[in-house]
A protein has these predicted regions:
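Nucleic-acid endo/exonuclease domains
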Residues: 1-119
């Protein structure tokens, strides 16, 4: 899948910061109803590679139906999967940072650290 502008910006911020991270991170037990693994855009790790937090960039298709992304049916599926991810993180005490597309212009290392509660 092609990365969005927001995802590219986040990747650049993580690379420049020197943080350990992986893209398209998934957990074996977290799947969509059809069995497809649900992936998080980024997983950020400490120096021992213990998970610190996950980042999800939420493009417009997470909030609005768009024919470009499959219309209302795709929107409902996207929102359902987003809720599965939120529940999973809550149940496993994993910090999930969701960045809406409306905040794309605010993206910076400080923005991410603030959202993680470290500023």
């Amino acid at each position: 899948m092609r990365a969005s502008r927001g995802e590219i910006t986040i990747e650049e911020i993580l690379q420049e910061s020197g943080l350990n991270f992986k893209e398209e991170y998934s957990f074996p037990e977290l799947t969509a109803p059809n069995g497809t693994p649900l992936r998080f855009d980024f997983a950020v790790f400490d120096d021992d590679w213990d998970l610190m937090f996950l980042i999800e960039y939420q493009g417009r298709q997470h909030y609005e139906a768009s024919s470009k992304f499959g219309g209302k049916k795709a929107l409902y599926r996207q929102q359902y999967n987003d809720n599965l991810k939120r529940r999973y993180c809550g149940l496993h005490n994993i910090l999930l940072i969701e960045i809406p597309y409306t905040d794309e212009h605010l993206l910076s290392f400080d923005y991410i650290m603030h959202r993680a509660g470290w500023c």
